[in-house]
Amino acid sequence: MTQHTHIATLHTNHGAIKLNLFGNEAPVTVANFVDLANGTKTGKPFYNGVIFHRIIDGFMIQGGDPTGTGRGGPGYDFNDEPHDDLHFHTPYKLAMANAGKKFDGSGTNGSQFFITVVPTEFLWGKHTVFGEVADDVSKKVVDAIAQVATDRDDRPNDDVEIVSVDIEAV
């Protein structure tokens, strides 16, 4: 059974999303997320003011790009951390967004992440699951965000902003 090592709370302009992070199963990914959220890697909290730039109702919400375009990141990449205990069998999984593998086989994870709203097992092995939505109130916030109006490129018509992120070790 997976035990969470941290709780991250994303304070958005649509409400708070509490996330359980699985640092034992995905230690590099969780450390990266925590360090970005706290500002340890960048000198200031990386996710504050960043938007969910891609929202697809019935699939997922994606954020973590400081440019808001889907092309930005922290300036470095790291490899996937697939784990047999972390799958997409159920909705509300937190995972790293990436651009697939580089020619040399290395990963393209950086700062972008997504939260699923349905089971998405076809993503396993392509994206590192490193957490899940922690409670029903947070799930309702995720569901509400997933249903905001978007343009044909899945960008919200009105910004869905991550105002701040709190991290708590457990």
Language-model segment annotations:
Residues 1-170:
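Cyclophilin-like peptidyl-prolyl cis-trans isomerases
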